[in-house]
């Protein structure tokens, strides 16, 4: 079952970098799809009742949150603002604009209880897809040494 996809056509204002950004978003969707994160989100039963307003697509909401964190927009208000004004987020969310309260409820109800399972699956998929070697640990491009700053 395909959880992370965009089936609708979307009018994007022609920008020089729009094709590259769409490719990045589709790569994000591919990684999320291959990781099996959709099954975890589905098992969380987010907003499963039919009472009230129609719920946002939880898979696309998760992809939007991940994309915002990748763009260093980590606060709820920044995520809400990006969802409202950023074309990339409008592409991901099919032009829906969730409020910061909706994003907060989704993070508290779905992401936080399942954070270890979600992010371990995503990490394993990224390692497998890009053939990364995780034997050596690097932080900010500097190899960690056992005797760092030890002068003889």
Q: What is each residue range found by the language model?
A:
Residues 20-66:
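Basic, short loop/linker segments at the boundary and entry of helix-turn-helix/winged-helix-like folds
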Residues 14-18, 54, 112:
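Hydrophobic alpha-helical scaffolding
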């Amino acid at each position: 079952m395909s959880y992370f996809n965009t089936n609708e056509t979307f009018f994007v204002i022609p920008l020089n970098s729009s094709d590259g950004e769409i490719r990045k978003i589709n790569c994000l969707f591919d990684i999320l799809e291959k990781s099996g994160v959709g099954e975890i989100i589905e098992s969380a039963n987010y907003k499963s009742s039919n009472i009230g307003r129609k719920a946002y697509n939880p898979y696309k909401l998760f992809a939007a949150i991940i994309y915002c964190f990748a763009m260093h927009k980590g606060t709820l208000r920044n995520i809400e603002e990006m969802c409202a004004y950023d074309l990339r987020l409008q592409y991901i969310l099919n032009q829906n604009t969730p409020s910061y309260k909706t994003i907060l409820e989704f993070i508290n109800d779905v992401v936080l209880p399942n954070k270890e399972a979600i992010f371990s699956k995503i990490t394993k998929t990224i390692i497998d897809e890009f053939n990364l070697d995780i034997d050596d640990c690097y932080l900010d491009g500097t190899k960690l040494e056992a005797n760092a700053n030890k002068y003889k």
